[in-house]
Amino acid sequence: MKLPIKGFGKVISDDKGILSIHYSNFSESKENKNSFKIEGENITTELVEDAPIEDIPTAFLKLHLISHRHFKPNALNMDNIFNVLETIAWTNQGPMRPEVAEKLVDGTSNLKIFSLDKFPPMTDYIIPSNVRIADTSRVRLGAYLGKGTTIMHEGFVNYNAGTEGPNMIEGRISAGVFVNKNSDLGGGSSTMGTLSGGNKEVISIGERCLLGANAGIGISLGNDCTVEAGL
């Protein structure tokens, strides 16, 4: 899939604005600029120019496009997404403002808050084919999981990051990091992403690599590399 793209979906809003958007259909856009239109609970978003993100509909559309495997990490401009998205309480009763959730939590309510975050869990919106995820709260919307990927309980995948598949992930894949096929991350291992301390270097791991348990890297790896445990 390539730009320009039109996304169709359902929006959840409150009196302060948009809380969440679930895009379920994509087609070619005929418009000449980025825009969105909301009619009731339906939303249509036009992504024509891949510019820094300026609104919530565009942010959610780009996150969906990556998790649907239409674009790989770093293929879309995700600049400014943190300034656009708001912190939301992701709960068993749907998304809500943290201040609203606070009023409902009294120790006896049935409200369960899964996270307070700008990004919801990916599987609330998208279930990619041929993957396993042991703890779905540890994969953010905007993660790219290729076929044959397994994310174990201690594995984590940030938005705009992911795996080509097949891969076994027991460590952390930070924003901007991409792991190529047949490479594995051991338990507790870390990859330094583009959100780490002002780091601008895009990190990738080549094919048939092993990042040992509790190891960490801040540089890219080529094919057939092994980083011993604890390094």
How should these model regions be labeled?
Residues N199:
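Core catalytic loop region at the nicotinamide-binding pocket of NAD(P)H-dependent oxidoreductases
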Residues M1-I127:
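Terminal amphipathic alpha-helical/low-complexity segments used for targeting or macromolecular assembly
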Residues V131, S137-V139, A143-L145, T149-I151, ...:
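A structural motif detector for beta-strand N-caps
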